[in-house]
Amino acid sequence: MSSVVVVGTQWGDEGKGKITDFLSENAEAIARYQGGNNAGHTIKFDGVTYKLHLIPSGIFYKEKISVIGNGMVVDPKALVEELKYLHDKGVDTSNLRISNRAHIILPYHIRIDEADEERKGANKIGTTKKGIGPAYMDKAARVGIRIIDLLDKETFKEKLEHNLGEKNRLLERFYELEGFKLEDILDEYYEYGQQFKDYVCDTSVVLNDALDDGKRVLFEGAQGVMLDIDQGTYPFVTSSNPIAGGVTIGSGVGPSKINHVVGVAKAYTTRVGDGPFPTELFDSIGDTIREVGHEYGTTTGRPRRVGWFDSVVVRHARRVSGLTDLSLTLLDVLTGIETLKICVAYKLDGKTITEFPASLKDLARCEPVYEELPGWTEDITEVQSLDDLPVNCRHYMERIAQLTGVQVSMFSVGPDRAQTHVVKSVWRLA
């Protein structure tokens, strides 16, 4: 039995999809455990670029099981569209399994999400307006509708009727928007469910059976630790738990069955949406990193905010997710920058702090304490191993490992699978 969790250590968009795809080659099951179609990941497979939002990266390996876990919230319409997108590209999806316990996103969730962001104005969270938060709210309030409910038309109708009474009052009286009629949703969404019903099962059984049979299972996190609803920059966070602890809740696999946790980090830092960002760059270096790194959101197309690598953030991620390994991505983007900076601590009211503050008010007042390192000019996109990297690049990686307290077991120097390199296997048994 061997299991690996892949988590983002920053604010998402770290390259988790690429690393998950790379590690999938040696896995026999790949599972997502939280989030929904608010998270986009880009994968290159057999020379073709794919952009997925719901379906796990392992879908391209027809001999491997791909799982949408119970901790996810699934937009049935988006799922059907993504399946069609893959089928149109000739991808076989018969290896997909969808948890019967996963909750679904309905049109009223999306409308409420949009209206709430609009109402908040300058205080908006910066959501993707995909209905994720409202769907998780319904789950916590115990009025959510699960995939198992969607497949039974009588149950679906009963729950939908009940919810529409409440949601329409909210939309019409509070947001002053038009509500929904039962017939606007019932038949259309029931039909979506019928289109993917053959994939639906108890995925906890599937995953535990795989582990008990000695198979390798890979858990794919979405977003990142700093967007975790408990451990992130609350309230500028997502509505679920991307940290490694979310695996046990969102997949139905116990913590004793998790072996290694791989934290994926960019060689710099990015963020989409609002909230404090201590190392954010507003100069030409930031612009260069954004353009060279193609830093635009997969889901929204929004330009990402760019900053220097923040070891305070990744140390926090190490602690709350129990990182055993670090995968450093987009090293090639930093090529040509004469002097690189790593944030080693913050200054808050004249005092140096080395741990990430819980208070956003404090975080907004934090000034980064930087350590400067010489950059490199050599093209690193064709290197085949750690030893091939320029000395300054290796020193940069070594310093990150020292400051974060996590060994760098993988690094990538470009978008292709062949540009990801292993220093130490994360599938090791010890």
Curated annotation (Swiss-Prot):
It is found in: Cytoplasm. Pathway: Purine metabolism; AMP biosynthesis via de novo pathway; AMP from IMP: step 1/2. Its cofactor is Mg(2+). Transmembrane segments: none annotated. Mg(2+) binds at residues 13, 40. Binds 1 Mg(2+) ion per subunit. It comes from the Bacteria. GO terms for biological process: 'de novo' AMP biosynthetic process; IMP metabolic process. Substrate binds at residues 298-304. Pfam families: Adenylsucc_synt (PF00709). The keyword ATP-binding does not apply. Disulfide bonds: none annotated. It is an enzyme of class 6 (ligase). It catalyses: IMP + L-aspartate + GTP = N(6)-(1,2-dicarboxyethyl)-AMP + GDP + phosphate + 2 H(+). Keywords: Cytoplasm, GTP-binding, Ligase, Magnesium, Metal-binding, Nucleotide-binding, Purine biosynthesis. This is Adenylosuccinate synthetase. It comes from Listeria innocua serovar 6a (strain ATCC BAA-680 / CLIP 11262). The gene is purA.
